């Protein structure tokens, strides 16, 4: 369920702080969100794919940890990011 390189480059370009920025928290959260959306669509079709479901839960947990880190360190970019990605604020 990996993202193709064109879609990944598009997400990186949209959320990067500077050119070539692939490791910032915002980019990581955006990439995880795209993978979560793809896995969710996959699991709607293949309901008994339990290994993918476990992978989805791991991705959601990782995104949750990154979002809590971003919320602590830079609340303004956190609030901007969750509005762009249509995520709920906890």
Swiss-Prot record:
Q: Which domain of life is it from?
A: Bacteria
Q: Which PROSITE patterns match?
A: RIBOSOMAL_S15 (PS00362)
In the record, what terms sit under GO molecular function? Answer: rRNA binding; structural constituent of ribosome
Q: Tell me which InterPro entries the record gives.
A: Ribosomal_uS15 (IPR000589), Ribosomal_uS15_bac-type (IPR005290), uS15_NS1_RNA-bd_sf (IPR009068)
Work out whether the entry's keyword set contains Ubl conjugation.
Answer: no
GO BP, one annotated term: translation
Query: Is rRNA-binding one of the keywords UniProt gives this record?
Result: yes
Please provide the record's keywords in A-Z order: Ribonucleoprotein, Ribosomal protein, RNA-binding, rRNA-binding
Q: Which CDD domains match?
A: Ribosomal_S15p_S13e
This protein's GO cellular component annotations are:
cytosolic small ribosomal subunit
Instruction: Name the PANTHER family on file.
Output: RIBOSOMAL PROTEIN S15, BACTERIAL AND ORGANELLAR, SMALL RIBOSOMAL SUBUNIT PROTEIN US15M
What is this protein's function per UniProt? Answer: One of the primary rRNA binding proteins, it binds directly to 16S rRNA where it helps nucleate assembly of the platform of the 30S subunit by binding and bridging several RNA helices of the 16S rRNA.
What family, per the record?
Belongs to the universal ribosomal protein uS15 family.
Q: What is the annotated quaternary arrangement, including any partners?
A: Part of the 30S ribosomal subunit. Forms a bridge to the 50S subunit in the 70S ribosome, contacting the 23S rRNA.
Q: What is this protein called?
A: Small ribosomal subunit protein uS15
Gene (UniProt)? rpsO
């Amino acid at each position: 369920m990996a993202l193709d390189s064109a879609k990944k480059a598009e997400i990186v370009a949209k959320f990067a702080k500077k050119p070539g920025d692939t490791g910032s928290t915002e980019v990581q959260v955006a990439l995880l969100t795209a993978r979560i959306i793809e896995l969710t669509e996959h699991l709607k079709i293949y309901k008994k794919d339990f290994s993918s479901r476990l992978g989805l839960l791991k991705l959601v947990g990782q995104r949750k940890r990154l979002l809590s880190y971003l919320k602590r360190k830079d609340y303004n970019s956190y609030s901007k990011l969750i509005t762009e990605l249509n995520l709920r604020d906890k």
